[in-house]
Amino acid sequence: NVNDTEHYVALRNLADKLDEKYDLQGNRIYYLAMAPRFFGTIAAHLKSEKLITDHGYNRLIIEKPFGRDLKTAKELNDDISAAFSEDQIYRIDHYLGKEAIESIAALRFGNQIVSSLWNKEHIDNIQITLAESLGVEERAGYYETAGALRDMVQNHILQIISLLTMEKPSKYTASELRDRKVEALQNIKVYSKEEALQNFVRGQYGEDADHTQSDYRHEEGTDEQSQIETFVSGKLETENKTLAGVPIYVRTGKRLARKSTQINVVFKNVDTNIFDSTDADSNLLDQNVLTLYIEPDQGYRLDLNVKDGGQTYGIMPIHLDYHKTAAEKAKIPEAYEKLIHDALDGNRTNFAHWHEVAQAWRIVDVIREAWDSEKADFPNYVSGSMGPQASQDLLKRDHRNWIFDATN
């Protein structure tokens, strides 16, 4: 019982015995995987009942969600900070523990060919897709209080964006990475209500085409008139000098055509196709695309244009692929395994700092408030599709298309 002082006393006695038995030198990690409303209470009791040692380290690992908006997140952070300092708090986001996410920095800053092209002069747009084929399953109760915007965009997607848009750190250290990521998130434009409605799309899944899968509103534990979104897509903009003007398209959803998390970096097309004598717009070359596969596959793909090998000088697209083998993937620790190991080591590189969390809420809160002001016409996409038509229209408005489409 998190409200019962005697339970904390019993826990302290047990911890002291284990400390003495295994010579732990007062080192303790507390892992909080429960409703956020209990975080402050637990932190206060850990301090008042003297579970926080005065020798060794004391660390607090906290699972998401970290609040429901900026206001509740700040209240939560204030409560926890009364007992633990910022350098003792480890806000865990399992996406940051994924090998492919951690490799973004290596790709960007470890390859001159990539880093020299990673700018607004060469990149046309960036696309981030976190697609899930399953519905809400047993998480309906949680989803009714969260939705895809809070569950996926506020943390996972914005963390990925910070890694894709941050300036180069002077060193790959926790403090340097934190500062660059905070700057990156501060450079993401916070929309007005009108801009949010114009640039973000929400969806809720209906039945599949064969009527074998139920719609969201008939899942166990959901409201039959629910306004909770199971799909989000949108356009974000960064105001940093390197990528200013490059649109960042994001989407995430449940019950989509195929499970896939990937990042598509779409490069600008060549000005003219010198290999075509007609000069027709329809004969433009395919754009170069660098794809980062996060899950379930892990790897990279680069789309290039080359001569087709025929008698005439025709051009054809090719794909340079690298995918980790089963043997390679077997050596990679699971995300939580890696992050807990990092916490034991005191390595905060892949944990979210409070300033990152706060700025992410500032970006998301406006979108949530805009949606709450208007009733959505749900359900608005078929299970097994790639989301509502409005998501496709969002890019077509800018004369672009989603690179990943599992329905083709």
Residue ranges and their predicted role:
Residues 1-62, 66-408:
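Secretory/organelle targeting and membrane-embedding segments
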